[in-house]
């Protein structure tokens, strides 16, 4: 099983233990020997192909569920006027707290693999309620974010059709060009359904690929009068941006919606919100 996260330079082919299996012991030994030539972390022989495949599926399902919990907590804490990241920092002082963060869940693994398991469970007569509940929460985050932006604009501007929103980030995760199953596309779609004028920028994505896959293109020249800016993907390129930059591209009453909390404590001239 050869799986690694796109853009991850720390967990490389050689440094990740490989789970292997085959139709018989001799074939499994052969596959293991091939991997052992390049994988310094070691090889784990699973007892069957089913076990190996199930291991990969639950790895991504577990991550999906943990992020879903963070997303649900973020929604609850927002209603309570509590900063989610402050709560996570406090909880993170405990050795047994798992460090996950809220955010959009896209890509071709985490948001997809759980459905293989729930589909198989359904065929066997079992309804995987927890897994599907997590999927529903994560898939609903794009709509949740778009609605928060709409509500803010209505309260502070009123004229939705004249409002402009900048979405920063279009790929499914940071520092990659991969746009497969990007939930940013869902955010853009939801925003446009409210008749908002949406501009999109991304230092890694290709405009033609976005147009082909989702029907929208990157904005070549940014405006200086956005009513809201949504930082959807925490690309490293964005880390150098500061309060002055966001002030230069937005109206005085604008909202900076920082989904991954990149600019916590750094935005003072505009209204700030994060998951």
Question: What kind of region is each of these model predictions?
Answer:
Residues 1-275:
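Structural/interface elements that position substrates and couple domains in central-metabolism enzymes
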């Amino acid at each position: 099983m050869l799986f690694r996260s796109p853009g991850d330079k720390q967990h490389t082919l050689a440094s990740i233990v490989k789970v292997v299996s085959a139709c018989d012991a001799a074939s499994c030994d052969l596959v293991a020997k091939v991997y052992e030539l390049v994988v310094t972390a070691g090889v784990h022989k699973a007892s069957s192909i089913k076990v190996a495949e199930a291991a990969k599926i639950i790895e991504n399902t577990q991550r999906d569920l943990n992020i879903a919990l963070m997303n649900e907590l973020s929604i609850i804490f927002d209603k309570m006027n509590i900063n989610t990241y402050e709560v996570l920092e406090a909880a993170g002082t405990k050795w047994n707290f798992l460090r996950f963060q809220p955010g959009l869940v896209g890509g071709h693994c985490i948001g997809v693999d759980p459905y293989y398991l729930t589909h198989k469970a359904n065929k066997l007569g079992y309804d995987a309620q927890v897994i599907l509940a997590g999927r529903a929460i994560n898939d609903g985050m794009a709509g949740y974010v778009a609605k928060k932006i709409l509500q803010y604009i209505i309260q502070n501007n009123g004229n939705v059709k004249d409002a402009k929103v900048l979405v920063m980030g279009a790929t499914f995760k940071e520092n990659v060009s991969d746009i497969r199953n990007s939930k940013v596309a869902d955010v853009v779609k939801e925003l446009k359904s409210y008749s908002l004028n949406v501009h999109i920028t991304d230092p890694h994505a290709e405009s033609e690929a976005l147009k082909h896959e989702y029907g929208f293109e990157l904005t070549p020249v940014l405006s200086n009068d956005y009513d809201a800016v949504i930082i959807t993907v925490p690309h490293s390129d964005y880390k150098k941006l500061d309060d002055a930059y966001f002030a230069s591209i937005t109206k005085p009453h604008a909202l900076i919606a920082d989904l991954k909390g990149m600019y916590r404590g750094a935005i003072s001239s505009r209204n700030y919100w994060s998951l």
